[in-house]
Amino acid sequence: MTAILITGYRSFEIGIFDHKDPRVSIIKQAIRKDLIGYLENGVDWFIFTGNLGFEQWALEVANELKEEYPLQIATIFLFETHGDRWNEKNQKVLSQFRAVDFVKYYFPNYEQPTQFSQYYQFLLEKTEGAYVFYDTENETNLKYFLKKAKDMPHYQLLLLTFDRLNDMSQS
């Protein structure tokens, strides 16, 4: 079994507030290309954390690819309360994350800040690599996960950056 964590920018972090934004289709094209590459190299599990934005779009692409490839999808939420306060539109997205092959909640609810690092350590230990939409020019809290991932020997990171997206949009 080979598992890849998929995570990246949330929609609000990159200023995308509408699913019909033309940037979403470019991002999804890149996701499709990269996920097919993973599948053709033997990856059989895609792991998500249940966030809106990049993960949401990658989940949509992964579900489409299930028709062509034998793959499994998991969502490992940080807390059982993840998304409880989301609006109705976002609740529909949350239900898609819960309708995958495997769902786990790492903690019942928030108690202390160390839960975040414990969660990321668990994700790193349970996956062989990560596909991350992230650019050092636009830092978020993902920088802490990436630092841990880069410190792990043999952990494979594939970054989708703004430069890669620009190259794709021009070709």
UniProtKB/Swiss-Prot annotation:
Coiled-coil intervals, chain numbering: none
One Pfam family named in its UniProt record: YpsA
InterPro entries, sorted: YspA (IPR010697)
Gene3D superfamilies with a match to the protein in the record: 3.40.50.450
SUPFAM superfamilies the UniProt entry points to: MCP/YpsA-like
Signal peptide: none
Family under the similarity heading: Belongs to the UPF0398 family.
UniProt-recorded name of the protein: UPF0398 protein MGAS2096_Spy1375
Protein source organism: Streptococcus pyogenes serotype M12 (strain MGAS2096)
Lineage: Bacteria, Bacillati, Bacillota, Bacilli, Lactobacillales
